[in-house]
Structures are given as structure tokens and as C-alpha cells.
């Protein structure tokens, strides 16, 4: 076991470690709006606020101008908290039923994580999923070989979830990390990158495996370089405001970033 200056890497779940393209939550948001109110949203609208907790996500979808316009046309008002509660109530059982189908780790994720563990680096994690969904996902992911040292769900903490730093900092506390600048936050969405910045960590955004590119694994594998570059540009645009320290395609590219951060820490740099 080598002695890395990095104490912990904190991963998001869907689109980062499991569920290439982050399709489990996206398709179910579409279904929940339909089931709750017979109201149609498309996949792009469902993806727009990804990374937030799921109640906040539903609220944010309702605030998208085009969605708000259609909602007003159908119901004569903007979406209320009671409406959000009803959609969330439809979302939860759908998500619990489907999340295990999207629990397979992204290519090389388990190998990369195990390589970090071999260096003595602790593995934290946090998710926009609520705890009752995580309770379904965690054991299935473990069967595939992914076992982080700690997991925080978006509704675990009274302070709330992203983009605030609380979930990341809960990992710091539970993993006995002594210095936030010795931590790396890896995520496929802007709110998760803001979370890492707000917690004082190095941040790594994923361009192609997650929500922002919205590719299936099959599309990713079949794509030519021009198609991938177009997807990268689409994702980069979503990450501009959150300004991650690093942008890479997928978790497969993380080891080189870890080496670079180790060198920067050894030279006295901070995030």
C-alpha cells in the first residue's frame, strides 16, 4: 500500500460509477410526471437539473420556462409544492423498482476504485437519490463488486443536498479525513461539482458517461470521434459555470488525474 497524499475520493453514483448515461432517474422523471398528472416532459427537460435531490429536481423541472408554460396551459397555474409532493410520491416506487436494473458499474469503475483502495485512499460517495432508493441500489452494486467505504443519500442530512457541501463533508467526517484539500469529488453533473468546490475539494467532471452527454453505453461504444467530440462539447457547456479542476471522459481516465493531484499536493498546491 503506497502512501498517497490524497485521503479520500468521493464519487457520485448514477452516471459516475453506475448507470452509464444516468438513465435510471431520467426516464423515471418522465414516467412520474405522466403518472402523477398525465403531463408530458421530454428526456432533455428531465435531465436539465440533474444532480439535485429528487424533490428539488422536480421543482426545478417545473421552473423550466417551457414546462411552466405548458403546466399553466393545462392547469391554469404554476406548479405548487403539493404538485411536487404528488409527483415525488409517484417517483419513489418507480425509482425503487427500476434502480437495480441500472446498477451495473460503468466500464473499469470497479478496477479504478480498487486501485485507489490499494493506494490507501478511502472511497466516499453521495447521491441525489434518497435513502430508500439507495437501500435498493447499494447491495446490488456490491454484488457487482462496488463497495464504497461510506454512502450519503440526499435526504440523510437535515441541511440538505447539493450544491451545498454537506453530503461531501459528511463523508469527510465519517471517513476520518483530516484535510478537505486531500479529497477529490468526482461527478457527472454541475451541482455535484459545486458541492466539491463548496467543500474545499479538488473536483473532476465526467463528460461522456453521465447526464450531460446523455449517451447510452452502446451509443458511446459505437460512436466515431466526431460524435464523441460533439457530446463532449455539449457536456462542457453544462460544466462551464461550475468550473471543475479537471474534465475527463469517464472514470477510466481518473488514474492519470489522481497522479496529477498527488503531484500538486506534494508541491504544496491547494484546490
UniProtKB/Swiss-Prot annotation:
This is Phosphonoacetaldehyde hydrolase. Disulfide bonds: none annotated. Binds 1 Mg(2+) ion per subunit. It is an enzyme of class 3 (hydrolase). The keyword Magnesium applies. Its cofactor is Mg(2+). Mg(2+) binds at residues 12, 14, 188. Homodimer. GO terms for biological process: DNA repair; organic phosphonate catabolic process. The active site is at 12 (nucleophile), 54 (schiff-base intermediate with substrate). Keywords: Hydrolase, Magnesium, Metal-binding, Schiff base. Coiled coil: none annotated. Pfam families: Hydrolase. It comes from the Bacteria. GO terms for cellular component: cytosol. Belongs to the HAD-like hydrolase superfamily. PhnX family.
Amino acid at each position: 500500500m503506497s502512501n498517497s497524499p490524497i485521503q479520500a475520493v468521493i464519487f457520485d453514483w448514477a452516471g459516475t460509477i453506475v448507470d452509464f448515461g444516468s438513465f435510471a432517474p431520467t426516464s423515471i422523471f418522465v414516467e412520474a410526471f405522466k403518472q402523477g398528472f398525465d403531463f408530458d416532459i421530454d428526456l432533455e427537460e428531465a435531465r436539465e437539473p440533474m444532480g439535485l435531490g429528487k424533490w428539488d429536481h422536480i421543482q426545478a423541472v417545473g421552473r423550466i420556462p417551457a414546462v411552466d408554460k405548458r403546466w399553466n396551459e393545462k392547469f391554469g397555474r404554476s406548479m405548487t409544492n403539493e404538485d411536487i409532493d404528488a409527483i415525488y410520491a409517484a417517483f419513489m416506487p418507480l425509482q425503487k423498482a427500476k434502480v437495480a436494473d441500472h446498477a451495473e458499474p460503468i466500464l473499469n469503475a470497479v478496477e479504478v476504485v480498487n486501485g485507489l483502495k490499494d493506494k490507501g485512499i478511502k472511497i466516499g460517495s453521495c447521491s441525489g437519490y434518497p435513502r430508500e432508493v439507495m437501500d435498493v441500489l447499494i447491495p446490488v452494486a456490491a454484488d457487482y463488486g462496488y463497495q464504497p467505504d461510506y454512502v450519503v443519500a440526499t435526504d440523510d442530512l437535515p441541511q440538505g443536498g447539493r450544491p451545498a457541501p454537506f453530503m461531501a463533508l459528511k463523508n469527510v467526517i465519517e471517513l476520518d479525513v483530516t484535510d478537505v484539500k486531500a479529497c477529490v469529488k468526482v461527478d457527472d453533473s454541475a451541482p455535484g461539482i459545486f458541492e466539491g468546490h463548496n467543500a474545499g475539494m479538488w473536483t473532476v467532471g465526467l463528460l461522456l458517461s453521465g447526464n450531460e452527454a446523455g449517451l447510452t453505453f452502446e451509443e458511446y461504444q459505437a460512436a466515431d470521434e466526431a460524435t464523441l467530440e460533439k457530446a463532449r462539447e455539449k457536456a462542457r457547456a453544462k460544466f462551464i459555470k461550475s468550473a471543475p479542476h479537471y474534465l475527463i471522459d469517464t472514470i477510466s481516465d481518473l488514474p492519470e488525474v489522481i497522479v496529477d493531484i498527488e503531484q500538486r499536493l506534494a508541491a504544496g498546491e491547494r484546490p
